[in-house]
């Protein structure tokens, strides 16, 4: 059961990562090749001023790094990501979720739903954020996230908000800064978005943490239930035999790990004898060896 669950998570993570990378690339290329848009100022190379683009780029880099681990997981029948990559993905998923919520609840009422969620914005405002949220919350779940990692995930948003405030409010467009393309300092006092941004972002991070950790705990409970079962014993013996058969050489001896098999039997609720388990191992080995 656990191997099937791990494989399912691995496949969905691979598909999600490929789609996010492809959609982000498509959206950014569309912005770069659109030199003029009457509804949006920042096209061409200026598209990299926008949080939408930078947040999607951040999560796409993280998802791109996931791909080699998923391929390795399918090959070795074990999918696992390092802790640093989970934290990186948390930061990226937090950023694009903020992008989605701002697009849906702030930009759409002012500019229209169709305008905000069509063209390149269909990929950058909707597809990538939603898929990243689902993948991180329910399928990339082999690490328990603590609150210190949630604080680290706020860094990209904090850096961008600080830069936006500097370029828009302190410097201003007349002196070479940015125009207020998000309207955050135009419709309300500039300090309000700055003060509200981090608490809202932290709430998003905690929501992602909640779903991710719930998936992690559910998987761990399943592992504990399976760990002492008859099926666990069989799967371990079969896996070990197949791995050793893959490394078999024409003139090498067949070695049955009897002590390890005995240890497995003693620590499960199986009623198999050591002899029966060794025979199972030998049969699996012979069925999978090339020689």
Predicted regions and their residues:
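N-terminal membrane topogenic signal
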Residues: 2-19
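Alpha-helical transmembrane segments of multi-pass membrane proteins
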Residues: 21-35
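Juxtamembrane "helix-exit" motif on the non-cytosolic side of transmembrane helices
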Residues: 31-40, 104-113, 170
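Non-cytosolic membrane-interface motifs at loop->transmembrane helix junctions
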Residues: 42-50, 112-123, 148-149
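Alpha-helical transmembrane segments in multipass membrane proteins, preferentially the mid-helix core
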Residues: 129-146
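Membrane-interface transmembrane-helix boundary segments in multi-pass integral membrane proteins
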Residues: 169-211
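Short, highly charged, low-complexity non-transmembrane loops/tails of multi-pass membrane proteins
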Residues: 216-235
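Charged, low-complexity interaction regions
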Residues: 245-255, 268-275
